[in-house]
Amino acid sequence: MSRRGNVKKRPVPPDPVYNSTLLSMTIRRVMRSGKKSLASSIVYNALASVGEKTGEDPLEVFEKAIKNLTPLVEVKARRVGGATYQVPMEVRPARGTALALRWLVHFSRARGGRTMESKLANEIMDAANETGAAIKKREETHRMAEANKAFAHYRY
């Protein structure tokens, strides 16, 4: 166990265009090799595309997608007497959001398509409509937790 104190959580500054911390976090997840301006242009163009295709406010569609992707429970491995159990645990809100963003970006990259902008836009729209690979991942996580409900008393 570490003897040091807890690390202070640093606040995430909101993005300059939509003034949203959620978008700022997404830009950081999309960013590769420190190219933040490229990442932000990808995210903003994807949102513009979402706005065109849906005819709704792109930020609202994005927030709905993240809400749909956020898991409520997950399983964590816990070793008890030589056996490893998958113990279902509730997900804290900050971790749930982080997982949702991670899945959104990961499955956008894995998706077929020409540009990252179009792939991200399509994944956002799919998540808002409760379809797509990222939603499937959340459902799978919930199924795993449901299947291992018997080990819930091993919670720590």
Curated annotation (Swiss-Prot):
Q: Which GO terms fall under molecular function for this chain's record?
A: mRNA binding; rRNA binding; structural constituent of ribosome; tRNA binding
User: What does the protein in this record do?
Assistant: One of the primary rRNA binding proteins, it binds directly to 16S rRNA where it nucleates assembly of the head domain of the 30S subunit. Is located at the subunit interface close to the decoding center, probably blocks exit of the E-site tRNA.
Q: Which GO terms describe its biological process?
A: ribosomal small subunit assembly; translation
Protein name per the record:
Small ribosomal subunit protein uS7
Looking up InterPro entries in the UniProt record yields: Ribosomal_uS7, Ribosomal_uS7_bac/org-type, Ribosomal_uS7_CS, Ribosomal_uS7_dom, Ribosomal_uS7_dom_sf
Name the gene. rpsG
Q: Does the keyword rRNA-binding apply?
A: yes
User: Does Cell inner membrane count among this protein's keywords?
Assistant: no
Source organism per UniProt: Synechocystis sp. (strain ATCC 27184 / PCC 6803 / Kazusa)
Quote a single Gene Ontology cellular component term: cytosolic small ribosomal subunit
**HAMAP family named among the record's database cross-references:** Ribosomal_uS7_B
Return the NCBIfam families for the record.
rpsG_bact
List, alphabetically, the PANTHER family matched: RIBOSOMAL PROTEIN S7 (PTHR11205)
Q: Name the domain of life.
A: Bacteria
UniProt keyword list: Ribonucleoprotein, Ribosomal protein, RNA-binding, rRNA-binding, tRNA-binding
